[in-house]
A protein has these predicted regions:
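AMP-binding/adenylate-forming core of the ANL superfamily
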Residues: 1-5, 17-18
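Short, solvent-exposed loop/turn elements at beta->coil junctions and helix N-caps
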Residues: 2, 64-68, 118
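Short solvent-exposed loop/turn micro-motifs enriched in small/polar/acidic residues
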Residues: 4-5, 9-12, 113
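AMP-binding/adenylate-forming catalytic core of the ANL superfamily
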Residues: 10, 15-108, 124-127, 131-134, ...
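Short proline/glycine- and acidic-rich turn/helix-capping motifs at secondary-structure junctions
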Residues: 113-123
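A cross-taxonomic marker for long C-terminal extensions/tails that follow the last structured domain
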Residues: 157-165
């Protein structure tokens, strides 16, 4: 129990990552113990997601580690834009990358920001990150029985498999 109470005085460390928006609402994005290994550094995808999600046009996001021959894994962000907002995808991607670099550090730099219409989720609303990682790594992932809308996974599979730019 000391490990959960000793990191920040008067606060309990849950291991969840998130952010507070400008209206004061708290969003829990996921576990900070979901880590990727980038050039020998263990980086929390939840921490990266919290920064990505704080961008004003982002409705939701998922960050996964994709295989890289040199660094082991590279962070790749999949972003759903808030409805009704027209964006310049390249500008938004550059802003997200810069924000992650400034707030977490260069080692956590998102190498690719992919704008998607939706993220694959379970019926209870959890993003299917493990399935996304498997497809990105070239594995033949079965469609989970708990998936809310299988067409979302079919639609983004080519984007998951695309090489990092």
């Amino acid at each position: 129990i000391d490990a959960y109470l000793s990191q920040t005085p008067h606060h309990y460390t849950t291991g969840d990552g998130g952010y507070r928006d400008s209206d004061g609402y708290l969003y829990v994005m996921g576990r900070t113990d979901d880590v990727i290994n980038v050039a020998g550094h263990r980086i929390s995808t939840g921490s990266i997601e919290a920064v990505v999600a704080s961008h004003p046009v982002v409705a939701e996001c998922a960050v996964i580690g994709v295989r890289d021959d040199i660094k082991g894994q590279l962070p790749r962000a999949f972003v759903v834009v808030k409805s009704g907002i027209e964006i310049d995808a390249e500008r938004v991607a550059a802003e997200i990358k810069e924000s992650v670099r400034k707030r977490i550090g260069a080692i956590a730099s998102v190498k690719d920001v992919v704008i998607v219409p939706a993220l694959p989720k379970t019926r209870s609303g959890k993003i299917l990150r493990k399935t996304m990682r498997g497809i990105a790594d070239g594995r033949d992932e079965p469609t989970p029985a708990t998936i809310e809308d299988p067409s979302v996974l079919v639609a983004i599979a080519p984007l998951l498999q695309a090489p990092i730019e």
